């Protein structure tokens, strides 16, 4: 996470006072300040020899409190591309490579002199001065799962007790809600047919920090764990519903953290703030038109191409949600790579570029970071079916907002697009 999403800064002394020893995981903070080792660059916290699994919450809270600050609240929108998008056909075209590698698409200039991306992404190209393309993401495994994008760890990696938490769960636990009427972490993605696309969990952070999943198009259909709003006519009915819910959950051994969950749910269900944020029909028609109309049909065994969810994500962070996650389409194109790209990329281009523009227009670009990526890249060589196969050695990402310095490309691959040649960046970063 970059650009101050975690908003944590510690000095050497603060690290020692908080009892933080041994370093593995870095959570980046604001662009001013010092490293724990005294070097002036990004502020960050390095936590525990076993990552965050070795650090108790009181220590984290003490460390965060000691950092002081009064910093501006940050949010993040993460757009997950299930299946693994083809980096060679998006942000890292290889026009000097052999034909079976370079493919059909041509590069086009962007709003940043000297930076080119695929002709299939003309609207993102016009937003490149507000974006950063990372061409050297590493650390993936050959496994179709959202786990590495949501936690930084492969699904099959060694886990601490409880499992690795999603970054949204970590932020929920460490920072809590900005507003009691809004959950800190909202997942807009549908439950996907390929189960590992849904694999990420709150892990050792606990079930109270699981993403809130609104269902339906807006407040009329909003449910919370099967509790229909229409049945909750008064607070007594609400409490009775939660009592039954607690008994059901207790039978499954998940009571730990339910008090916090109930408090959050009570605030959500007794306020109209969340329902109003989900109801984008009240948005300016020109803004709705900018995002465009999506397609609710499920692609492959993954997600639909719903452009409206990008608008809803913006509305949610504006209303006070810290983390919003979205899944878009299905990118596992072992065949007909270019036919699929011509169907999906124009919609992807419109939705992502509209989000970047909208955040800028509303003055949210310094406080809301956007991260777009999938679980791995694709093979340099196009196969006999006109597709690209799995390639975990390197992949790509697109960043925007978050107060980060944009208008640049980070990292590079070799001449065939198969290996990270410059500035490899791990998913955990």
Residue ranges of model-derived segments:
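Ligand-binding pockets and gating/stacking loops
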Residues: 5-9, 13-15, 19-429
